């Protein structure tokens, strides 16, 4: 087996490029071998793969001219319509010859091509993600020149036209920008802005200019169509972390130094706790909106699922279970108030509106653009509350089982009491719905 490799290398050393790349035997019938003739493609013998050992002394300039004369006598029948074999040999000499430098871009590339590539890379970066990284843009071979500095970005109004930040300098964020939310969550957007800059203080952030490039318009269109909760999550993250992005979790990597995964369960629960304790939702003389209550229940259920399936904390974090119990108790209280109003016959659902258009009167509910009458509204509300309550029962049972696995202590006892209390509230609300 050891002798087969040198013999195979000897057979391939004098072969043409096509036979060498395919690792097939070449009959070396210059100027065109049999396989290249069958494939109807030019048969090229590279100078770098010629037989014999490489010379001890560096080759002279005459060797390159002799190689050009040698490869210029090939059969013109086998050449491609776009160019001759002599041009291909010259290109191979420029790339594979000794002392030659491999050029990424052709010499005929102009500054206009580089500017077009910069615009394309910028649009792709803006469409694929919310942040623009200059490091990925500078890796493009068409931009690795001084012509890139002539490319001007769309600066917002009020900035100097001649000023442009260096690509290598870190971005300067003078203020925290609250992401744009759809009209349905407009009340939360105003609350987020008041939480960032003071509840009674003036709004110091200048609204971004709407006359932006087409890529920003595409992003805003995507937000309005399908990324409703993604924009809401960014707004919650802006308030929770003061606009610094996802916070680092100190206990996760310290407890699991060999784990490459990063657990964001506590981050999600901190956002949920911020929502639950928000002044807009915790008003003494009024109840929470019905659509916001349903949204919080959906968020609680998704966090339950993430915590139970998390491979980092392995569903054993008592602090996570305690936080989820507190948030779940808030949601169950809101749903039980709705069930109590339905069972007692009191029509207090005028404030539980969900929709894009205002209702005709204060006692109607809008779902999308359709206004429901009293009977249909009560039936839909009853079905929604019953479904949401029943969905949380197996989750609470799973939490009770996970709590028994943890070490006994005051926190474990508190979680057991909270789970039993939440389970009792769920059964009580379901009983009121059946009456």
UniProtKB/Swiss-Prot annotation:
Q: Where is the composition biased (Basic residues)?
A: 50-59
Keywords, alphabetical: DNA-binding, Metal-binding, Nucleus, Transcription, Transcription regulation, Zinc
Gene Ontology cellular-component terms for this entry are: nucleus
Indicate the residues that the entry says bind DNA. 16-43
Q: Where is the composition biased (Polar residues)?
A: 76-89
InterPro entries from the UniProt entry: OAF3, Zn2-C6_fun-type_DNA-bd_sf, Zn2Cys6_DnaBD
Cell location: Nucleus
Q: Which GO terms describe its molecular function?
A: DNA binding; DNA-binding transcription factor activity, RNA polymerase II-specific; zinc ion binding
Ranges for the region named Disordered are 48-89
Asked if Membrane is a keyword of the record, the answer is no
Instruction: Give me the stretches of Basic and acidic residues compositional bias.
Output: 60-74
One Pfam family, short name: Zn_clus
Described function: Transcription factor that regulates the expression of the gene clusters that mediate the biosynthesis of the host-selective toxins (HSTs) ACT-toxins responsible for brown spot of tangerine disease by the tangerine pathotype which affects tangerines and mandarins. ACT-toxins consist of three moieties, 9,10-epoxy-8-hydroxy-9-methyl-decatrienoic acid (EDA), valine and a polyketide. ACT-toxin I is toxic to both citrus and pear; toxin II the 5''-deoxy derivative of ACT-toxin I, is highly toxic to pear and slightly toxic to citrus.
What other comment is given for this protein?
Gene clusters encoding host-selective toxins (HSTs) are localized on conditionally dispensable chromosomes (CDCs), also called supernumerary chromosomes, where they are present in multiple copies. The CDCs are not essential for saprophytic growth but controls host-selective pathogenicity.
**PANTHER family named in the record:** MONODICTYPHENONE CLUSTER TRANSCRIPTION FACTOR-RELATED, OLEATE-ACTIVATED TRANSCRIPTION FACTOR 1-RELATED
Please report the name of this protein according to its UniProt entry.
Answer: Transcription activator ACTTR
Naturally occurring in which organism (per UniProt)? Alternaria alternata (Alternaria rot fungus)
* Chain's gene name: ACTTR
């Amino acid at each position: 087996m050891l002798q087969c490799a040198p013999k195979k290398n000897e057979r391939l050393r004098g072969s043409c490029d096509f036979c060498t790349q395919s690792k097939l035997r070449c009959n070396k019938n210059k100027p065109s071998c049999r396989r290249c003739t069958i494939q109807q493609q030019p048969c090229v013998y590279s100078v770098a793969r010629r037989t014999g050992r490489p010379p001890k002394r560096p080759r002279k300039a005459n060797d390159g001219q002799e190689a050009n004369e040698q490869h210029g006598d090939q059969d013109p029948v086998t050449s491609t319509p776009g160019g001759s074999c002599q041009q291909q040999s010259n290109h191979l000499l420029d790339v594979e010859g000794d002392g030659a430098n491999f050029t990424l871009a052709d010499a005929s590339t102009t500054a206009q091509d580089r500017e077009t590539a910069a615009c394309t890379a910028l649009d792709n970066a803006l469409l694929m993600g919310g942040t623009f990284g200059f490091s990925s843009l500078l890796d493009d071979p068409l931009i690795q020149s001084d012509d890139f500095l002539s490319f001007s970005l769309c600066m917002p109004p009020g900035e100097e036209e001649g000023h442009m930040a260096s690509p290598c300098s870190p971005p300067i964020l003078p203020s925290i920008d609250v992401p744009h939310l759809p009209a349905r969550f407009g009340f939360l957007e105003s609350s987020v802005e008041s939480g960032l800059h003071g509840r009674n203080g003036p709004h110091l952030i200048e609204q971004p200019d709407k006359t932006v490039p087409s890529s920003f318009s595409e992003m805003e269109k995507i937000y309005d169509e399908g990324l409703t909760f993604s924009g809401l999550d960014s707004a919650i993250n802006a308030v929770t972390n003061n606009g610094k992005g996802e916070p680092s979790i100190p206990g996760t990597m310290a407890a699991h130094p060999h784990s490459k995964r990063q657990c964001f369960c506590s981050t999600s629960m901190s956002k949920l706790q911020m929502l639950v304790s928000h002044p807009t939702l915790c008003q003494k003389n009024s109840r929470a909106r019905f659509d916001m209550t349903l949204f919080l229940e959906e968020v609680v259920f998704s966090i339950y699922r993430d915590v139970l399936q998390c491979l980092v904390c392995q569903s054993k974090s008592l602090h996570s279970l305690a936080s989820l119990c507190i948030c779940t108790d808030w949601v169950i209280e809101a749903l039980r108030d709705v069930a109590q109003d339905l069972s007692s016959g009191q029509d207090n659902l005028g404030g539980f509106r969900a929709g894009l258009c205002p209702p005709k009167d204060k006692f109607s509910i809008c779902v999308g653009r359709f206004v429901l009458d009293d009977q249909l509204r009560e039936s839909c509300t009853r079905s929604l509350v019953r479904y949401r309550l029943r969905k949380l029962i197996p989750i609470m049972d799973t939490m009770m089982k996970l709590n028994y696995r943890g070490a006994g202590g005051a926190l474990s006892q508190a979680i057991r009491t909270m789970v039993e209390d939440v389970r009792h509230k769920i059964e009580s609300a379901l009983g009121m719905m059946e009456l």
